[in-house]
């Protein structure tokens, strides 16, 4: 993987096209690497109108939610003439990676592009691998166009990450790279971190349901399986104060497996990382919840809002029996790019702040600095930084 990045950095488009031909069996040129307006129009003709409508409805909710996250620059003028503040500036450019293959995830396109757009990022570059014919999944193109991508390129894998991080003749370097991908994409993002910013290294999907005897076992089982179907490394955990509920959920799971299309993946996922844990008290259950710090947490108990106040660690919290996890994946509005592998203890969901940088503002008048210049000089001298002290002192040499 590092070799791919090194070649992209050294050879640019030449290496990018070679790796695309090698891995995606698609020959690209400078004239065909970027998705055209005609290709976007053609994508709309291939996508059902019902899906386009749903994408637009979801987009409204996602945009509305992220608009509430925006923060303005602020300034604080003090009586002595001092002005302190914080200037908010959107990143100039962002790269969004979208997986290709047989599966299309337009929801992921929306979740990664919308917060960048709301933040004010002017250049949003999406990359996604093409098929052998040099085409991109139509639903992916429709979602990208609706969300506001400014450039779309037909490249994927570690080579696409390298192009975004270092730039090539066809693709300009960006300031930050976001979006999910396979292990090679994840490792490539990790390798270029520091040269550009990245969102996170996402792990397998996780769900934890905290439930008591008021929960509907039919619903709980369905929600656990909604994440177990992602892949064999996904985790699905029920923490409950009711032994009876745990037994009923197990029965419901066995019934669902007989009719779900991805039953084989689900069975392996549950075998690897599926658990039903019984706690004696709700407080004990909450200790487990906070220790695991799941990507998705559902609270299905009596007084769920009260229980929610005791949760310290979770990526997204779904409250009540009708707030099923897929609601957050597709439609509610909060971002579905969430911390995994216990990182919800210190990381947050993807949000507008991820696409903004903050600059501190400091202004002192002569009188304001004069009042405290001796204090600064004392500090600097104590640290042995005489040039620091001199930088302040020279302004008052004649006084």
Regions found by a protein language model. Name each.
Residues 291-399:
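C-terminal core of ALDH-fold dehydrogenases
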Residues 122-131, 236-242, 249, 320:
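Short internal beta-strands
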Residues 76-142:
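Conserved small-residue-rich beta-alpha loop and adjacent elements
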Residues 230, 238-314:
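A glycine- and small/hydrophobic-rich beta-loop-beta segment
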Residues 111-122, 145-147, 165-171, 189-191, ...:
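Alpha-helix C-terminal capping segments
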Residues 1-92:
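N-terminal Rossmann-like NAD(P)+-binding subdomain of aldehyde/semialdehyde dehydrogenases
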Residues 148-219, 223-226, 230-235:
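Conserved NAD(P)+-binding/catalytic subdomain of aldehyde/semialdehyde dehydrogenases
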């Amino acid at each position: 993987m590092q070799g791919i990045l090194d070649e992209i950095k050294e050879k640019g488009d030449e290496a990018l096209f070679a790796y695309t031909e090698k891995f995606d069996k698609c020959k690209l040129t400078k004239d065909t690497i970027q998705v055209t307006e005609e290709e976007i129009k053609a994508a709309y003709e291939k996508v059902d109108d019902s899906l386009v409508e749903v994408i637009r409805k979801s987009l409204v909710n996602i945009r509305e939610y992220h608009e509430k996250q925006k923060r303005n620059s602020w300034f604080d003028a003090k009586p002595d003439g001092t002005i302190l503040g914080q200037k908010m500036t959107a990143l100039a450019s962002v790269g969004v990676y979208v997986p290709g293959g047989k599966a299309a995830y337009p929801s992921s396109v929306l979740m990664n592009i919308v917060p960048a757009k709301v933040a004010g990022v002017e250049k949003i570059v999406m990359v996604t691998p093409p098929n052998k014919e040099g085409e991109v999944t139509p639903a992916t193109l429709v979602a990208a166009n609706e969300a506001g991508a400014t450039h779309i390129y037909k490249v994927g894998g570690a080579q696409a990450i390298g192009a975004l991080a270092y730039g090539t003749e066809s693709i300009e370097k960006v300031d930050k790279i976001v979006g999910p991908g396979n292990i090679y994409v994840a490792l490539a993002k990790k390798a270029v971190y520091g040269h550009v910013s990245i969102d996170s290294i996402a792990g397998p999907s996780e769900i934890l349901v905290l439930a008591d005897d008021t929960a509907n076992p039919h619903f709980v089982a369905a929600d656990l399986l909604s994440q177990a179907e992602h892949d064999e490394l996904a985790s699905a955990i029920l923490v409950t104060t009711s032994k009876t509920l745990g037994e009923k959920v197990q029965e419901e799971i066995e019934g669902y497996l007989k009719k779900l299309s991805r039953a084989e993946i689900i069975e392996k996922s549950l075998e690897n990382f599926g658990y039903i844990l019984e706690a004696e008290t709700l407080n004990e259950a909450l200790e487990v919840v906070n220790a695991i710090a799941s990507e998705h947490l559902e609270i299905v108990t009596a007084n769920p809002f009260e229980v929610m106040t005791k949760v310290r660690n979770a990526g997204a919290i779904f409250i009540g029996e009708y707030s099923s996890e897929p609601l957050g994946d597709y439609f509610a509005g909060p971002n579905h790019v969430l911390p995994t592998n216990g990182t919800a203890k210190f990381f947050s969901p993807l949000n507008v702040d991820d696409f903004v940088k903050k600059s501190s503002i400091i202004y002192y008048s002569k009188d304001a600095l004069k009042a405290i210049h001796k204090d600064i000089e004392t500090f600097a001298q104590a640290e042995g930084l005489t040039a620091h002290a001199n930088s302040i002192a020279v302004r008052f040499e004649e006084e």
